[in-house]
Amino acid sequence: MPVVDTIAAIATAPGSGGIGVVRISGPSSRLIAEAVLGHCPPPRHAAYLAFRDAHALLIDRGIAIYYPGPHSYTGEDVLELQAHGGPALMQILLKRCLELGARQAEPGEFTRRAYLNDKLDLAQAEAVADVINAATEAAARSAVRSLSGEFSARIHSLQQKLVDLRLYVEACLDFPEEDIDFISQGRVAEKLAEVTAGLEAVFREARQGNLLREGLQVVLVGQPNVGKSSLMNQLAGEEVAIVTPIAGTTRDTIKNSIQINGITLHITDTAGLRETNDEVEQHGIARTWRALENAGVALLLVDAAHGIGKVEKSILARLPQFLPKIWIHNKIDLESTPPKIEEQDGETHIHLSARTGDGVHLLRQRLLDIAGWQPSGEGVFMARSRHLLALNKVRDHLEVAAGRLMQAELFAEELRLAQDALSTITGEFTSDDLLGEIFSRFCIGK
């Protein structure tokens, strides 16, 4: 359905600033320019002009830039008015544009129009919001990579490999008289392996990009008085949790976010797990288990002097099997033993002192490893949870396809489903409901 109306919004953040921008997009942009400025400035040239109201009274003087479509952000005629950034002045200028026939833009509507006009694909459109909301330098750089199209290019490369494989398989189905035994030739299995390897590489980078965006949820769990709050304070670099020798001091979950090499860690300190008749403490313990349901990694603390006992094993048994876990043997300062990290039966054990900080660097590095952190950060692009879900769905269809190599029609159908799932990332195959959900989370003016 073609867009026939013109939208306007304040594109800069709320509050006072040196410069404020009102953005207009749509067929009436040129007429609004003529009414506010007296004439439409030359395309893509910054012009210093007077902005006037309906009575020709001066609103402000500033910079006006006119971008005729399709060579604009939205693909439509776009006008940007840059004035002094006072909130009242911005509202006067926006009101003037609305009087001239524009309507107030909805959140994300400018970027949505850019997507609908093929100026951006969906992954790039989402990256616009991610660039704005990036909390770290690493997150900002990865979001810019997505906005520039690096993520989309990787997805399109995978799509092309899938298309090539589908064409080959379906040609064999459509022309059986040619008697091409593509299965015995091994070419299909080889091509499928190439697609799967490419998918895994993209998934690893997307997962790190997602961690840059969302952060890693780290939950500290263990019996009372094993040093969970001390470890949280050590990781945070400040006292965010109360520490006393009294068991059961922490009765509720305490949350704090820190950054290690650009990765945000959302750390949750929890109530010690034990049998208790204290109603308040019981509520805290219930919250501990709820926090673990959303954890990205669990730190299981034990007293280094006592080691892992029945209580710790019972805690371990209740944790999700897929959840990454690290055993923290705390209080090595009391045992006069050095810090160390070791692997035992597929589990990571770190010996440290939360009180002195000795060995905490080993934990920080292990958390970065779990997050998939790469020292260079090269090639990492911003990815959202929906992208990981889509990539997982592609992986599932490819795994099913691998088991149906001798059933050509079923094999071809799994390839089609894999391609459809992959296409949801860039928006070639996406529902209107999903588009509404994505763009509604943008700020107004983008």
Curated annotation (Swiss-Prot):
Details of cofactor binding: Binds 1 potassium ion per subunit.
Binding sites annotated in the UniProt record for K(+): 225, 244, 246, 249
Subcellular location per the Swiss-Prot or TrEMBL entry: Cytoplasm
Coarse class of the protein's main subcellular location: cytoplasm
Record has Nucleotidyltransferase as a keyword: no
InterPro entries: G_TrmE, GTP-bd, GTP-bd_TrmE_N, GTPase_MnmE, MnmE_dom2, MnmE_helical, P-loop_NTPase, Small_GTP-bd
Cofactor: K(+)
Transmembrane segments: none
GO biological process: tRNA methylation; tRNA wobble uridine modification
Family indicated by similarity: Belongs to the TRAFAC class TrmE-Era-EngA-EngB-Septin-like GTPase superfamily. TrmE GTPase family.
Complexes and interactors: Homodimer. Heterotetramer of two MnmE and two MnmG subunits.
Name of the protein described by the UniProt record: tRNA modification GTPase MnmE
UniProt organism field: Methylobacillus flagellatus (strain ATCC 51484 / DSM 6875 / VKM B-1610 / KT)
Record lineage: Bacteria, Pseudomonadati, Pseudomonadota, Betaproteobacteria, Nitrosomonadales
